A protein has these predicted regions:
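Catalytic phosphate/metal-binding cores of nucleic-acid and nucleotide-processing enzymes, i.e., regions
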Residues: 1-116
Length: 116
């Protein structure tokens, strides 16, 4: 499976925007002034850590909107489509890296059980 991350702000081509407004968007931000309603965390790393916990919770509790978005990306990637997740952070650390990790980790079953 090929999953890449592209920077939307820089005009890099992407197949799927995963920023705020998308079911997989990060509800946490280290940017206090431009958070667009996101919950503030002191650093980028803490915002990504909080996102990892949030995404794990969504999967474990079978949030259909989130789980279906992950399933769709995994099925398309398994089918040979090159997935390019669009965000505004790349190449800096980003929640899209967590999304890619969860999709590629086939031990994680979206909706049935969660090993992570």
């Amino acid at each position: 499976m090929e999953i890449f991350i592209a920077n939307k702000r820089l005009g890099e081509p992407y197949s799927d925007y995963v920023g705020r407004g998308h079911p997989l968007g990060n509800p946490f931000s280290h940017l206090s002034k431009k958070s667009h309603g996101a919950k503030y965390r002191k650093t980028r790393e803490l915002a990504i850590f909080a996102y990892r916990e949030w995404l794990t919770f969504q999967i474990e509790n079978k949030n259909n909107i989130v789980v279906n978005a992950l399933k769709d990306l995994r099925m398309r990637a398994k089918g040979g489509e090159v997935i390019k997740l669009g965000c505004f952070c790349h190449p800096k650390p980003c929640h899209a890296e967590v999304i890619r990790e969860f999709i590629l980790d086939e031990r994680i079953s979206f909706g049935e059980q969660n090993v992570k």
